[in-house]
Amino acid sequence: MQHLLEYMPEDLPVRDTDSSPLLKGTSGKNVRAQPHLGRMNQKELNCRRLHLHEEPTLVKEPSPKQRDKNRRRRTNVQRSTTTQPDLRTLAVLQEPERRRRPWVSASPSPSAPPRAPVPGRKAHVQRLCPSTAVGSAQPRVHAGRRLPHIAGPNDRRSHTAPPAFKDYVADKNTRIEITREPSQLTHTMTTDSTHVEEIPRSPEKTSKVEKPEQRSSEECTQKAAELRASIKENVELIRLKKLLQERNTSLAATEAQLTRVQEAYEDLLQKNQGILDTAHNAFLSQVNELKAELSEESKKAVSLRTQLGDVSILQITLKEFQVRVEDLEKERKLLSDSYDRLLENMLDSSHQPLDSSHQPHWSTELTGKQLPPQVCPLLDQMGTALEETKVFRQATNKAAQDGKLKFQDTDILYQHEQEEESLQSTATVASSPEELCELAAQPTLLPQTDQRESSEPKAQDENDLSQVLSELQVSHAETTLELEKTRDMLLLQRKINMCYQEELEATLTKADRENRDHEEKLERLNHLLDFKNSRIKQLEGILRSHGLPTSEQLKDVAYGTLPPSLCLEPLAAHRGDDEVDMSLLHPSENLFELHVHQAFLTPAALTQAGDTQPTTFCTYSFYDFETHCTPLSTGPQPLYDFTSQYVVQADYLLLHYLQGTSVRLDLHQAMASEYHVLATGWISLDKVLGTVERVHGLATLAGAGGEDLGVLEYWMRLCLPLKPSLQACNKRKKAQAYLSVSVLGARKVQSNESRSETWAPQNELRVEITRCCGLRSRRLGRQPSPYVMYRFFTFPDHDTIIIPASSNPYFKDQALFPVLVTSDLDQYLRREALSVYVFDDEDPEPGSYLGRAQVPLLPLAQNKSIKGDFNLTDSGEKSNGSIKVQLDWKSHYLAPEGFQMSEAEKPEGEEKEEEGGEEEVKEEEVEEEEEEEEEEEEVKEEKEEEEEEEREEEEEKEEEKEEEEEEDEKEEEEEEEEEEEEEEEDENKDVLEASFTEEWVPFFSQDQIASTEIPIEAGQYPEKRKPPVIAEKKEREHQVASYSRRKHSKKPGVQDKNRMEYLSCNILNGNTQQMHYTEWKFSGLKKAEDGGLKAQDKREEPPSPRSALRQEHPSHPRNAFSLADQESCEQASEVSETQTTDSDDIIVTPQAQTVPKADSEKMCIEIVSLAFCPEADVMSDETIQQVYVEYKFCDLPLSETETPMSLRKPRAGEEIHFHFSKVIDLDPVEHQSRRQFLFAMLHAQDSDEGRFKFTVVSDPLDEEKKECQDIGYAYLELWQIFQSGKDILEQELEIVSPRNQAIQIGRLKVSLQAAAALHGIYKEMTEDLFS
């Protein structure tokens, strides 16, 4: 045991850095179960250290079991000593001792004395504490040979063993420890035997002591094994801690190295980034340079293209010039030939002597005989020219002579000087006799030279004269040639004048014939007018004789010049100073007053307002008037005291509005410059109908969530009773109808038509706009403020209220449209759709809308109601929510066929004779009977005034029945003229009976009405004739004037005059389309009287006192690409084959409908909008104020292919809308040239010829006397449409400058529907080519 404890630390090397794991046995398991030393706190480490310190002490104390074991061993030793010891056993027991001796102490000397015997107690203590024995103390340092269990050197370098060697080392250490344990046990046994030898004991005692010692030794061995395992674990932990420290050190070094590497990497990354930035910048600069080069090249390419186009044009012009040059050369050749001939003639005539005036003899002959009198001025000019040339010739001759004389003088002087020099030279030199003779002979030579020199000027003068004469002859020949040309021109002009004279004579004869026809027509019309006036006077005499109103009185009532005597209720006596004078009101007008007095707000309202003294005001709108606003008021009980006065037209629309509509009143809170709706209330208007006094009431103010926020005190009233006003309105309408019937009764057919349309059945259509859902604003991030607008039939536009900031607005808007059931209405219901537009009030862009819904009206023509949600689509044909619409009739709808007479049933007009005395007697008898009936009906009418509305409906039914009876009577008596006249008289009597007995009683006293009937004939004219041509022309001119007023609304300019002239020609030629519009003025009678016998077939509503006379027209909602609408509007005539529409102008509807054409036989072009670039030169040009767009197409005139009106030049970022569409007929039979034109564009080799060209033109103002100029071109490729097979819908085209087509100045948005037509034309033409 002593050796076990002492040698245990020596089993492990002092510096073992091997990182091998623990043994794979129980020790390994124990090590893994123990916590790491680094994770244990200080307290646990101290406890464990004390426990390890006490364990050796406990181990040293022998347990009873160990003591028993020791006793048994001693007993065995004693027995072996008593007997003869076994040598082998002794060797075995001494072998460990021998092996331990070198480690226990140094080799003892052979002369060492033997140890002294130790006492028993000392031996016992030595046995219990073997580590204290001196002789057995073990050194701590290796002092001799290696231990037997160590296989290799003790000292090893760290980190020398590979990782795979760790398990092997652990297994080896385990084997060494296992082999060491038997040696230690052997050593213990030998030690015990020595003790036994020292203290011999008895066998009994020995046997008693052996058992406990043996047990104690076993226990000690077990504890020692456990202790050894724990020590190993601790040592292993210490080793691991050292290893951890080393690893931490290496990790720190690695981290330092890593930081250095990171720094180096960052430096390298920065360098690379800098290099990359430099390369990137260089690359971008290169890209920019390449872009600049590309733009330059593109500009060059565009310029080259334009040059190429110009070159093509120049080539064409060059060819033309070449042809002209050839013609000029031929003409020059002819002129040269004629000139040569004339020159020869002149030269031949020059040999003949000239007269005193130096003129050739043939000139006088030409003047006197050949040339006409018109050439005399030219001959005079020629004579003056000849005189001038003669004077000029004399002057030139004189100058030439002077020059020649000067030249001769100079020659003579020069010769004289030479002679003097020669004489001087001869004087100085000695002269010989020969020279003197020569000098003497020289004077004789001088006269000869003078004679030669004098003869030379004469010859030269003759040559000059002949040259001048030839020049004069040439000029004279040229003058003669010009005179011949002038003669030819005069002859041609004479022929032209003769042609003009013949045309003038034909025109004059035609005009005379037309004048005679016109005079004849005027005579007929005057005859008819006189006959009508005589009949009117006769009937008025009958009316006066019976005390009934005449036509003048009817006119007074119809046009309001004679106010009816209304039985008004007495007004209140406490009227204020600000009251309106009732005498200023029209008879059919009334005054409605709405007074907002005071509001009482609840604490909840003040809490919601966030102020105890809020500043509030109220807004409300009544009928079709603008919104009114009260003044500001502060406090929880604001006092407004504000009265709104409305002058309204008393009709059934107002009655229905007051009966079923409530006025919405909004209470706003004002905060600085902003305000918001605090509460909303509704004011019911039906209580005001029963009285003319003030109707006081309280309106509950509710918040957005329905909570009660207070009440509002108000009062309202109608200043005049509504029932008499309605009666006056009805009487006025019927008076106008009677006047129109009496005036338009010139012909029987027109009378029947006017009567049937006047008494056409009435109905009322109710249109309700309930709500919209899912609306999206065109501006991102904002909610729209929507309102709805639509137009039904010929009525004006109707719009709803504006709902601020709502994507799901709730309108509940109802509109009533009283209509006459006519064929036009039925046709409109069966073929058209109601376009409902939703606009955003906060959208600044004009012409834009949130959505559009198409509501088909066909169910209404079938007496069915329409109700449902309809999808809304924006201008880009994208869905933008839905709208709920409801349309239904007030009463049963019947088609107009049941109320109109068929063509076969209508009697033919025949000539009528003047009335005889017998007919007048019959008429008087019938009148007396009818007057008695009128008296009875007047009595009944006085009793039934309160139930007037119901009775009117019954009367209308009775009138319809009477008309049917009258028609039956007419059918039976068509052949007899007298009976036919009597029937017409009966009809007119019935008409007046229904009118006078029911309507005129309140206007005239009872004593003025006699008990007789009044016969009124619808018309008594000789025969059925066509409408007069003059009346038609006047009506058409009226249409032209009204169209131009609506279309242009300004003084027509140059282009406007051209458009009006073209339109007027079409209208006057009878090729126009009927323009349906309703004028809000009573011009039916005047139209009928001025136009001759024109039917007034519609009832017209009185004008509103708030507005001037207006003209309303049915502008069906624009749908540029609705093929069904376009097909239904096509015409067969040449002028009406195309149709132009404009969103701001009237829509022309056709008179006659034709079979819709296929898509391959027509094309539609629409010019939608226009916008200019802000940097374009057009924007800065002040001379350009208005623009329009035009294009050229084959044989169509520009008046049809240009926008109907010019618009203001758009500002920067603004877009103007034309919405000008045109359907072009491409019929293969009638318009083959147009199809060939399109085929040529598709096959054009030149890019310019294959493009559709739009031209933007500036339109000067009226006061500017300037011409229109082209400011831009836009091109559309037809080949793209042909290849894609798709129509173009609102495509933006670039507008280029005319001077430089590489510069873009704006955008033009157009649409073209021609894909099917282009495919059909291409297929047809190619088949014709290859067939």
From Swiss-Prot:
Subcellular localization(s) per the UniProt record: Cell projection, Cilium
Biased segments, Acidic residues type: 910-988
Keywords assigned by UniProt, alphabetized: Cell projection, Cilium, Coiled coil, Sensory transduction, Vision
One Gene Ontology cellular component: photoreceptor connecting cilium
Effect of loss of the gene: Mutant mice are born at the expected Mendelian rate, appear healthy and are fertile. They have initially a complete set of photoreceptor cells in the retina, but the photoreceptor cells present defects in the outer segments indicative of cell death, and loss of photoreceptor cells is almost complete after three months.
Tissue spec: Expressed in the retina (at protein level).
Residue numbers spanned by region Interaction with RPGR: 1136-1326
Gene Ontology annotations of biological process type: eye photoreceptor cell development; neural precursor cell proliferation; retina development in camera-type eye; visual perception
Chain segments carrying region Disordered: 1-165, 183-220, 351-374, 899-1057, 1088-1146
Comp. bias regions, Polar residues: 77-86, 183-193, 351-367, 1129-1141
Coiled coil: 236-352, 498-546, 908-999
Biased composition (Basic and acidic residues): 41-67, 194-220, 1022-1039, 1088-1115
UniProt xrefs under Gene3D superfamilies: C2 domain
Highest taxon above the source species: Eukaryota
Family: Belongs to the RPGRIP1 family.
PANTHER family to which the protein is assigned, alphabetical: RETINITIS PIGMENTOSA GTPASE REGULATOR-INTERACTING PROTEIN (PTHR14240), X-LINKED RETINITIS PIGMENTOSA GTPASE REGULATOR-INTERACTING PROTEIN 1 (PTHR14240:SF3)
Function: May function as scaffolding protein. Required for normal location of RPGR at the connecting cilium of photoreceptor cells. Required for normal disk morphogenesis and disk organization in the outer segment of photoreceptor cells and for survival of photoreceptor cells.
Summary of subunit composition and partner proteins: Interacts with NPHP4. Interacts with NEK4. Forms homodimers and elongated homopolymers. Interacts with RPGR. Interacts with SPATA7. Interacts with CEP290/NPHP6; mediating the association between RPGR and CEP290/NPHP6.
Official protein name in the record: X-linked retinitis pigmentosa GTPase regulator-interacting protein 1
Provenance organism: Mus musculus
Name of the gene this protein is made from: Rpgrip1
